[in-house]
Amino acid sequence: MSLTTLHDTICALSTPPGKSAIAVMRITGSDAIKISAKCISDTDKIFTTRGGDSFYTNVVDENKNHIDDVIVTVFRAPYSYTGEDLVEIHTHGSTLIIDLLQHLLQSSGARLAEAGEFSRRAYMNGKISLQELETLVLRIQRQVMGTEAF
């Protein structure tokens, strides 16, 4: 990851892929709020919501067609996991809805996060220590290898 990519706005599914009741898409970076606003019906709410607060709205496409009912939570810098503005969009877990939301976010200016990029940003912004980052990496590796329960 180059230094220039540290300033990009990124998005990623933060819940396991596949069928589920709820999926959470995370968006972080300097344009996270502006990009997320392009994908919801209540654009004013995202700009006025206090950090840590949530609101109900709809994900809409470029033509303002309804895609899904969602809960949006806004975390304002520096009071987020990454230390940057961060938005969580809690949507239904349909793979079609997740794919549509991801496409909307990308077409609005976000790029897909690299593996571990949210945690790298948290480390680079002083939100977690190197020891915490290394522990997180080891835990994920164990989960992937099946040696640790979720």
Predicted features by range, described:
Residues 1-150:
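A glycine-rich (often HGG/GG-containing) alpha/beta subdomain
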